A protein has these predicted regions:
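Helical "substrate-binding/catalytic lid" subdomain
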Residues: 24-153, 157
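ATP-dependent carboxylate/acyl-activation modules
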Residues: 10, 159-161
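Rossmann-fold dinucleotide-binding core
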Residues: 1-37
């Protein structure tokens, strides 16, 4: 049972949840990661738009952190270098959570959505974007390197090969 496993799980992590019946935890994980993949693309788009508009990205980042545009990718795991210490974007996108793992989770989320006839247009688009990014040889980069896709020719950051 969950209660008997909880002490062991607490050794492995600090946020332990009981999501429901068998399999619900996996479902919750892919729902969370679908939202994360979508929001990382959105954060990347917003910051790269600021760059193209010649607005100081650090200023936009500060504004977004304290405004309605805040999200986990903005406040905790920014997709562009120089915005926060200790994140993969400041380490040539060496993975914390790889693009390949994000692509796998997005694919699983879309398969589950299709199975239960859930409408997930943003999840489907994020899945396509990450799948293409991985097929281009980026599956072992951090998932925040997706900023390279939306940045186009304005993206001029160093990435680990």
């Amino acid at each position: 049972s969950f209660d008997s496993a909880k002490p062991i799980l607490e050794i492995m992590g600090k946020n332990i949840f009981h999501a429901g019946d068998l399999g619900c935890g996996n479902g919750a994980k892919i729902c969370n990661n679908m939202a994360l993949g979508i929001s990382m693309i959105g954060a990347s788009e917003a910051l790269m738009l600021a760059k193209r508009l010649n607005i100081d990205i650090k200023k936009v980042h500060e504004i977004m952190k304290s405004a309605s545009g805040n999200s986990w990718p903005i406040s905790v795991y920014p997709p562009l270098p120089g915005l926060k210490e200790g994140v993969p974007s400041n380490n040539k996108y060496r993975p914390g959570f790889s693009a390949g793992m994000m692509s796998k989770d997005l694919k699983l989320a879309i398969e589950c959505a299709e199975e239960v006839k859930a409408n997930t247009p943003l999840g489907s688009e994020a899945n396509k974007i990450y799948e293409k990014f991985c097929k281009e040889g980026n599956d072992n980069k951090d998932f925040s390197a997706i900023s390279k896709v939306v940045g186009g020719d304005a993206w001029d950051y160093e990435i680990d090969n």
